[in-house]
């Protein structure tokens, strides 16, 4: 469906947040939503991020289409693809409930320069971490 980024991350793994997160939003034919959250922490430069930043919108709310042949989201995924799974809500209005979340346990590296560019254009565009409210969080592979 779409993907977007938040700075800082809107998720915590073992009470630790990440510098950024990429949300890969999926929707099935019944309209049900699932989001894969890829945590991003300072490290090596990420080649996919370089491509995406070239097409990054400069104003909040703008939508940009990147040529499909340039976009291989596998380049964003960490080697270890184990994840936590829970039912939650979208993190942007209207914050709809009933969303299946899969938060990857291992962060993907992003260069400090890549992080700095995003954070200058979109400072603190993250929703505060929400309480679990009794939601079951399970570890999956």
Language-model features, listed with the residues they occupy:
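Extracellular or lumenal secretory-pathway regions
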Residues: 1-19, 23-141
């Amino acid at each position: 469906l779409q993907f977007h980024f938040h700075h800082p991350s809107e998720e915590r793994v073992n009470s630790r947040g990440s510098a950024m997160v990429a949300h890969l939003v999926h929707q099935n034919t019944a309209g049900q939503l699932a989001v894969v959250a890829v945590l991003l922490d300072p490290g090596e430069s990420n080649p996919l991020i370089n491509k995406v930043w070239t097409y990054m919108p400069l104003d909040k709310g703008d939508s940009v289409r990147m040529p499909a042949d340039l976009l291989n989201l596998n380049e964003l995924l960490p080697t270890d693809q184990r994840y936590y799974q829970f039912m939650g809500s979208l993190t942007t209005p209207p914050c709809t409930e009933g969303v299946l979340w899969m938060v990857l346990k291992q962060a993907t590296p992003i260069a400090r320069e890549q992080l700095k560019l995003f954070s200058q254009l979109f400072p603190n565009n993250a929703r505060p971490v929400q309480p679990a409210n009794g939601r079951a969080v399970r570890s999956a592979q």
